[in-house]
């Protein structure tokens, strides 16, 4: 049995080695590339990309699906805020209730349809504090993001989202011991430079509904989001836990932990959303009437540059339900990608959603009143992000190759030890 197992591992490693031969010829053998024509290098480069996509077709199809869901989630989150941005607490808690019902129902169906042994083994493990920590971090992220989105325009929103990449890289390097290749840093640097150039151009434009303070609030949400992703990484890698169970329990905790973040609405310097506790019950009542009955309450002394946004509650429930649907799909796909692949894959996919969101704002049937006119700057930004992502992915491929070689050397050493022990016997 040992010989058969070693033979299978050797065959698998040989297959993986074939996958990286083209990469070696392009990256490692620099002198050979220098002697080839530019056309040959470009042809070889695209051949590597083709082989990469062929060998990971499932990953890329899943990534495209997740990308589409992410874009729709962010677009309808913004449309929901445009309709009832004065009632962020109401939309957040109502969304939590919907998620509780959906995830608990899905997990109940899973328990009934799965084998008893699988469910018994999983239910014996207690992840109480992990669930609480993830839910607390997610609740903080949702609340802070909702606050930031109230005065963050579509283009700025999509560009700020890309800052999650260096933030994730830093936290995973410091706390999870991730080690990156030079190409990972280069890819992230290209993306950051693209962001800097875009922000420089946009800073000369007049954007009345954009607020630097709220941009910074939205950026601060990345800290809690990164810690939440790290906790999920530890739970998925060290413990085998069902995705439905994770989301069902986390959203249940999140319904209560989000109440702990409630005092943020009472911070005086947040003038646009400042709401004393004495007005909380009135705000909740008006928010529910806006969501379910389409009644506008705040219609005077409101709008761009004013303390309050004007209510636009007609059809708010349709927009809100659509947002909840895509947000639930977003959570499930994100957990699945982290579970089956890695947080690196999740980071790469998250990178592309920025320019994708920007392009989505070109279409009125998606963006609604927040529709934007196409600009050359947006397409240059998309090119910069894609180029940085490709460089980032090449770094991952090189790291994967090193792991394969390390695993092959380890298997060869074990085979030699087994052979020596057999000869001695």
From Swiss-Prot:
UniProt source species: Plasmodium berghei
Side of membrane Cytoplasmic, spans: 1-56, 110-126, 179-181, 232-249, 340-347, 400-425
Name the record gives this protein: Putative chloroquine resistance transporter
Keywords: Amino-acid transport, Disulfide bond, Glycoprotein, Membrane, Transmembrane, Transmembrane helix, Transport, Vacuole
Role this protein plays: Nutrient transporter. Involved in maintaining the osmotic homeostasis of the digestive vacuole.
GO cellular component terms attached to this protein's record: vacuolar membrane
Gene Ontology biological process terms in this record: amino acid transport
Residue ranges crossing the lipid bilayer per the database entry: 57-77, 89-109, 127-147, 158-178, 182-202, 211-231, 250-270, 319-339, 348-368, 379-399
């Amino acid at each position: 049995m040992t010989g058969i197992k070693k033979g299978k591992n050797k065959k698998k490693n040989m297959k993986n080695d074939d996958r990286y031969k083209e990469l070696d010829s392009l990256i490692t053998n620099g002198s050979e590339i220098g002697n080839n024509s530019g056309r040959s290098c470009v042809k070889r480069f695209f051949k590597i990309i083709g082989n990469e996509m062929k060998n990971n077709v499932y990953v890329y199809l899943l990534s495209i699906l997740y990308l589409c869901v992410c874009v729709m989630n962010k677009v309808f989150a913004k449309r929901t805020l445009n309709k009832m941005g004065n009632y962020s607490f109401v939309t957040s808690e109502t969304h939590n209730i919907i998620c509780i019902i959906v995830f608990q129902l899905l997990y109940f169906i899973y328990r009934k349809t799965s084998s008893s042994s699988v469910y018994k083994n999983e239910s014996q493990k207690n992840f109480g504090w992990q669930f609480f920590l993830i839910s607390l971090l997610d609740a903080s992220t949702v609340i802070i993001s909702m606050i930031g989105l109230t005065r963050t325009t579509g283009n700025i929103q999509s560009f700020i989202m890309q800052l999650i990449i260096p933030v994730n890289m830093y936290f995973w390097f410091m706390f999870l011991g991730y080690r990156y290749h030079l190409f990972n840093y280069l890819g992230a640097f290209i993306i950051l430079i693209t962001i800097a150039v875009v922000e420089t151009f946009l800073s000369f434009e007049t954007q009345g509904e954009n607020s630097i303070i709220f941009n910074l609030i939205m950026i601060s949400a990345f800290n809690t989001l990164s810690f939440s992703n790290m906790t999920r990484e530890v739970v998925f890698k060290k413990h085998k836990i069902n995705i439905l169970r994770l989301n069902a329990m986390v959203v249940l905790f999140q319904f209560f932990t989000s109440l702990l973040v409630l005092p943020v609405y009472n911070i005086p310097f947040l003038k646009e959303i400042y709401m004393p506790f004495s007005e909380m019950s009135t705000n909740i009542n008006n928010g529910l009437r806006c969501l379910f009955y389409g009644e506008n309450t705040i219609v005077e002394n409101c709008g761009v540059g004013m303390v309050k946004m004007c209510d636009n509650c007609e059809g708010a429930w349709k927009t809100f339900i659509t947002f909840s649907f895509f947000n639930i799909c977003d959570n499930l796909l994100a957990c699945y990608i982290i579970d089956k692949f890695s947080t690196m894959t999740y980071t790469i996919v998250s990178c592309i959603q920025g320019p994708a969101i920007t392009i989505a704002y070109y279409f009125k049937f998606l963006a609604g009143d927040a529709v934007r006119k196409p600009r050359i700057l947006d397409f240059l930004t998309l090119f910069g992000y894609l180029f940085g992502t490709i460089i980032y992915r090449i770094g991952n491929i090189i790291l994967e190759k090193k792991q394969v070689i390390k695993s092959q050397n380890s298997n060869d050493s074990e085979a030699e030890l087994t052979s020596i022990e057999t000869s001695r016997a």
